[in-house]
């Protein structure tokens, strides 16, 4: 069988991989096999960490809300605050509550005092 050189197609594929791996360090940015493996690994990590990022932010928001609610003893804890919010049908998500807790603590105290009544 004759040898197929695949010049243009192979070069285009390798160029695409090299462009992706241009910011990698060492051989991972220069050698095609190493760059291909590193590219697959990078994509796996990116996919995994997109899910982890959602969990991390939710955890951060909960920590911030809990810190502010315990600070002045407005509500006893985060869980009671959230329970009372749902009971009163106030649809504020954790991201918004965390922003309020950081930027305007008085507003969060007003909200929680209204809920307790």
Curated annotation (Swiss-Prot):
Key words of the record: Chloroplast, Plastid, Ribonucleoprotein, Ribosomal protein, RNA-binding, rRNA-binding
Main location: plastid
One BP term from GO: ribosomal large subunit assembly
GO CC annotation: chloroplast; ribonucleoprotein complex; ribosome
GO terms assigned for molecular function: rRNA binding; structural constituent of ribosome
Pfam families referenced in this protein's UniProt entry, alphabetically: Ribosomal_L20
Cell compartment(s), UniProt: Plastid, Chloroplast
InterPro entries xrefs: Ribosomal_bL20, RIBOSOMAL_L20_CS, Ribosomal_protein_bL20_C
Similarity comment text for this entry: Belongs to the bacterial ribosomal protein bL20 family.
Function: Binds directly to 23S ribosomal RNA and is necessary for the in vitro assembly process of the 50S ribosomal subunit. It is not involved in the protein synthesizing functions of that subunit.
NCBIfam families: rplT_bact (TIGR01032)
Entry protein name: Large ribosomal subunit protein bL20c
The organism of origin for this protein: Acorus calamus
